[in-house]
A protein has these predicted regions:
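Membrane-interface amphipathic segments in extracytoplasmic regions
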Residues: 1-268
């Protein structure tokens, strides 16, 4: 890498962008199944956030504080400036973004960083330190996770970068994907539960054969038994269910019948 390359910002993305006229981005919120696509699309650039640079809104505030917040903020700001400028100068940029129903997505994100979320619970609730109550996990999830994150992700990330407002275009719930175009940006949004049936469409979109390679991560995680028990016993508060399932995000990407099924799932 040349001495003129920008200083260490986790530079793999920079080198990949520099080498490609028509880069492919797997650009989506975390915990929607991105690892399957990463392994299936060589030389793709994987992003969860670029335009939003406040780490505490995306991950546990406790975890964010472990990474020198001031330095991390500057790094994220520089990455946004450099990458967005490079992307807008490319001949074509293809972006794939997976979506998932938001409550399930937030549960997966919670467990991925479980120690940090529990630390936030203990730091903010003195009674939690002395308690052995089984609902501590439920309380930590409801009280400390930023539940708005998936609902706002497209408005905070895709729209500022590409100018594409996915909510102004109908989404084909049966097909499970939609393609959008603006200037040099092509965006394909795919529902993760429709990923396998969308492989041919993804291949057409990327102009290369794509075979999605699944490796089920959740069953092999250290927290798998806890996650199974959490899902068995967790009954979200009505306010949380309604906030998530009546949101613009959920109504756009899921049909009325599918949302009714999600209500049944989380109210049961």
């Amino acid at each position: 890498m040349s001495s003129s390359t920008p200083i260490s910002l986790s530079m793999q993305w920079y080198q990949l962008l520099k080498e490609q006229d028509s880069p492919v981005l797997i650009y989506q919120m975390g915990k929607v199944g991105s690892s399957a696509l990463e392994k299936s699309i060589p030389k793709s650039i994987h992003l969860h956030d670029l335009m939003s640079i406040d780490a505490e809104k995306q991950i546990s505030p406790v975890r964010a504080q472990l990474h020198n917040p001031a330095t991390n903020y500057i790094k994220r700001l520089l990455k946004r400036l450099i990458m967005s400028r490079m992307l807008k100068r490319k001949k074509q940029v293809r972006i794939i973004s997976l979506v998932r129903e938001p409550i399930g997505r937030n549960i997966s994100m919670f467990f991925q960083s479980l120690p940090f979320w529990m630390a936030a619970k203990y730091l903010n609730d003195d009674s939690a330190v002395r308690s052995e109550r089984s609902q501590l996990l439920h309380e930590a999830f409801e009280e400390h996770v930023n539940h708005q994150y998936p609902l706002e992700w497209f408005d905070n990330e895709i729209k500022p970068l590409t100018g594409i407002d996915v909510f102004t275009h109908p989404f084909d719930h049966e097909l499970g994907y939609q393609v959008y175009q603006k200037d040099n940006f092509s965006l394909m949004v795919v529902r993760v539960d429709k990923l396998d049936q969308s492989q041919k469409a993804i291949s057409t979109f990327l102009q290369q054969e794509v075979k999605v390679q699944h490796d089920n991560q959740a069953d092999n995680k250290w927290y798998s038994p806890l996650l199974v028990e959490f899902k068995r016993t967790f009954h979200p508060k009505v306010a949380l269910i309604e906030e998530m399932l009546t949101s613009k995000f959920t109504k756009h990407f899921f049909s009325t019948k599918e949302i009714e099924n999600l209500h049944t799932l989380y109210y049961s």
